[in-house]
């Protein structure tokens, strides 16, 4: 059985009516990397204004990537942001792939 990992970008409430497919991947690692590299979560959702002013944008972005990667390590979704990401795992039978 093969698995594919479908990433959805959604709103703060994970509602299905505001959910867009952001990509399809062959591994969870690839899906997490895509979210971490291409997320649309603002820095002010992670840090207060004082921290943003004192620290370089590059350092802040690296910390955001680390936090997202850690959050997605066990869970298949982000929570608590204005824009969230869900990872769905789809199991596909081998016979289906061979047939089509």
Predicted regions and their residues:
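Small side chains
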Residues: 22-23, 75
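Short aromatic-glycine-(Arg/Gly/Cys) micro-motifs in beta-strand/loop hairpins
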Residues: 1-21, 37-38
């Amino acid at each position: 059985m093969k698995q594919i990992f479908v990433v959805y970008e959604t709103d703060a409430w994970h509602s299905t009516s505001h959910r867009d497919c952001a990509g399809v991947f062959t591994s969870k690692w690839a899906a997490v990397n895509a979210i971490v590299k291409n997320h649309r979560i603002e820095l002010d959702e992670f840090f207060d204004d004082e921290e943003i002013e004192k620290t370089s944008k590059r350092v802040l972005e690296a910390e955001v990537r680390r936090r997202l990667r850690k959050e997605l390590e066990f869970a298949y979704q982000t929570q608590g942001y204005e824009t969230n990401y869900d990872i769905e795992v789809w199991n596909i039978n081998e016979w289906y792939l061979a047939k089509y």
